[in-house]
Amino acid sequence: PLAPASGDSPAPGTHPDPAAGSPATGPVPGPATTGDVASGTLFGALHTVCGEVEDLTDVTIRPVTVGTDRGLDGPLHALVLAAREAALNAATHSGCAEVHVFAEVTPSGVDVFVRDRGPGFSEADVPPDRHGVRHSIRDRMVRAGGDVRIDSGPRGTEVSLHMPS
C-alpha cells in the first residue's frame, strides 16, 4: 500500500472524536487524519490520506492529482478530511478492491471525486447513528464553504467535493 508521506502509519481504531475540533475544519487532526501537514500541500495531503485508508482497509486507493498544487489552508484541509472519509467509506462498504480519488485544481477552486464500483447505497437508508456521510463529509464541507454531491446507484458511488477559490 501507499506509505503516508510523513512516514507514520496510524494504528487501526485511533481516529479522533469526529465531534471535536473547530467549526471551520471539523476534527482536530490526529494520527489518522493529519494530511501532509509537513509539506503543507493539498496534493501531498491527499496522497497521505489515501495511504492511510489503504493501511486501514487493505483496499487499493488510486489518487490522481491534476493542476497546480496549492498550500493547505483551513478550507482545503477540511476538503482533504472529507475526501479521506469518502475514501474510507468506499473502501469499507463498497466491497471493491480499489477506490479512485481524482483531484483537480482549477481557477474556480478545487474538485475532488471519490469513486467506487460497488452496489451503491441510499443516503436516506444510512442509520442516524452513522456520522460519516452526514457529519464527516457534508457538514465539514459546508462549514468550510464548500459543497458535496453524492451520486450512488447499482454501478457505483461517486462523492463529488468542491471547494471554491
Predicted regions and their residues:
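DHp/HisKA dimerization-phosphotransfer hairpin of two-component histidine kinases
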Residues: 1-62
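Conserved short strand/loop->alpha-helix "switch" segment adjacent to the catalytic nucleotide/phosphoryl-transfer site
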Residues: 40, 59-84, 124
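Conserved ATP-binding N-box helix of the HATPase_c
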Residues: 75-99
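Short beta-strand-loop-beta element adjacent to the nucleotide/active-site pocket used for signaling
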Residues: 105-112
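Glycine-rich nucleotide-binding loop
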Residues: 109, 120, 153-160
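Acidic ATP/Mg2+-coordinating residue in the GHKL
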Residues: 116
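ATP phosphate-binding glycine-rich loop and adjacent ATP-lid/helix-beta elements
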Residues: 125-154
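C-terminal beta-strand of the catalytic ATP-binding
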Residues: 161-165
